[in-house]
Amino acid sequence: MLVEFRNRALLAALCGLAAPIAWAQESAETTTLRRVTVTDSAIEDRFDADDTDPVSRVRFDAPEVERQHAKNLIEILRSVPGVTADLQSDGETIKIKLRGIENQRFRGEKPGVAIVVDGVPVFERTGKVNVDLDNIERIEVVKGGASYLYGDDALAGAVIVTTKRGAGQRGLRFDADRGAFGYRRHLLHAGHAGDAFAAHLQYAEREQAGYYFLSSSRARTWSGNLQYALDDDSELALGFERSARFRDREGSVTGVTAARTDPRGRNEGRGYTRNFDVDLTRWNLRWSRDLDERSNLLAVVYEYRDETTYWSAPMRFDASGRPTTNVLDYSTLNDYRQAQRGAKAEYRATFDALALMGGIDLRRNVFENEATALNAFRTTPRGAVTPAGTLLSDDRTRERMRAAYGEAKFALGASTVATLNVRRDLVDAEFDAAAVPGNGHRRVSTGRSFEVDSYRAGLTHALSDASSIFASASTGFRLPSAEQLFRGETTTNALVRSNPDLRPEKAISVEFGARRSVRLAGWQATLGASLFQIDRDDFILDSNGEYASSNTTIGGGSQFRNIGGARSRGIELDARTSPHRSWAFEAAATFLDARFTRYDNAFVSLGNGNGSFVADPSAAQRADPAFWRSNYTVVAHDNTGKRIPRTPSRMLDLRAHWFPAPGWTVSGEIDYRAGSWADEINQERWPGRTLLHLGVRHETKLPGGSGARLLLFARVDNAFDRRHWLIARGANDANFDGVYDGEDVSIVPDPGRIWRFGLSLRY
């Protein structure tokens, strides 16, 4: 069924391109063919995209990134249409999502967006993004299925980050910022450039006490790059980053009442996870050579390491069976270690009306998980005691991936260019679990292999020197995780089953768009518009629903299966102007309709999902609070046709910049997000909000002949102190009272008005 679906979607998209392609071929007989180049690369973004790119793409260079003085990545990406990111914990925790894909999931799942840093595909255990903002040279967002270039998890697109490098990093720099809730930031940077080399070293630290109870965070990062010209045509560059991070709870509270009366969470003090200690290490060695003015070679080798420990699953009952809400009472200590190593190589060549690129991508990944009981606990008041220190799980996943990919771009006339991409991934996954009490002392050794093909077909046509239209169809995929494949091997629960026959999740993206450069009332503006649809068929769901209890035979036991379907469609609009009459403007608008197309097996748990399942509780049982603390039932829902939660139907970001005098910039931003559903059954709402953000910046050259420059800035987010929720997530009866309502929704209240100011001294 999946293959038929994929073929039908691709055929429909390509038929839609056939008419303009045929027209262009006829025109080519009488018109000079256009010279084209391949600008896509899975290694390096040195090739600027041009008007022959058949997808939506937004790029921020270093000056744009630095001008915003952003505290987190979403403050930059808000101006990108289609970004539906999860933002939590004073903005320190971000999961980037695009066009509503994967917004229904909110735990440690992958986000459906490939994150690539200097050619290194980065996957972090929690699915969050830990990118050092102080080390960013460039950010690029590619929307639509992008597995044709980046492979696994590029269901909705990719975010490509390029870190600082090159001669532009020469000189000395010192930054110091202060802000609300104990926010502090410092940066030291030193760089040098000669005729054949450029190098820099940088230290950055950020910390804050946090608005929420137990929400402190800190990050200390060393980074650097050495770039050396081997000769006139080749270059070698070594980049590294070493980061030690800590963050505590995300700031969530349970229920709308707590969000209103206790937004800091002082009376709760517990989220599902807390006490994250994260050590990240990344290095990459890149080589490039221009063979001639029409062809070049690129290669990179890399390693990325992530060592993370954290607490999860707050205890509901202590070892004596008494209810507990102590902030130290968590049941699980998680120790996660991963190492991602790989190498990529690309060759590209231009033959006037034809351009080709081919590459190979080799990866060796190791993921190790160990979970132990942090404290002694019971899951029900009279259940068995799990002693502290009990080894709950100890497993390792090894992945070996080999991929070949390529792109062909060819002119069909003076104004029309077609693009074709193909990629094949071969992946071998091996899963080993030690014999521990948590899995009944069973030793597990198993595995699975996958072969996945990804494609893109695109067309661009220049209507004039200032405007063009484009269309494309592309695919994205995500491999099943080890948990989804082999979960039944790691538990003693007979109702939890493995499914080694799972297929990779697939997505088909179709997009039609237009770009135009035009003068509006004196302002030179670039305008963009796109119409898109992303279809997912047979995506992976638990047979009991996304986050339902695993202790029931409803749904045939708890097993991950290819049984879900979803569709995201919408319109994206953006506009940016150059400065004119001391003003410049930006606008980004998104109109999104994201729905489940197949999801008839959703179950909402009422009561304690770790207790005993009762299919049809009596009236007396339903009225007894003690019953719900030790038992539960489920309510079935058919979510087919319902909106995917946390996907607002409308988003708007408007920015204005005023330049009243040389060196001065005053900025304002209106950030609007419509309301959406907080749960899959579309019962509880996440209200919308409109926020105003303000900023001022002044840069001046200091007296004397040193060439030193001083930059001062101040920024106020949520200037009117509007109270709203950063995120809202509902799934089951969190209070164990037999009712699912707004008091069960996990909510992160917004901290309100936040201010920051700082200075930067540069030599």
Question: Where are these predicted regions, by residue range?
Answer:
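N-terminal periplasmic "start-of-domain" segments of outer-membrane beta-barrel proteins
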Residues: 34-68, 94-97, 113
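Short acidic/polar hinge/loop motifs at secondary-structure boundaries
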Residues: 113, 118-144
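Transmembrane beta-barrel wall of Gram-negative outer-membrane proteins
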Residues: 178-207, 212-251, 273-296, 352, ...
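Surface-exposed extracellular loop regions of Gram-negative outer-membrane beta-barrel proteins
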Residues: 253, 366-368, 373, 380, ...
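Gram-negative outer-membrane beta-barrel transporters
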Residues: 411-418, 426-427, 524-535, 556-679, ...
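C-terminal beta-signal and adjacent terminal beta-strands/loops
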Residues: 477, 671, 675-677, 698-763
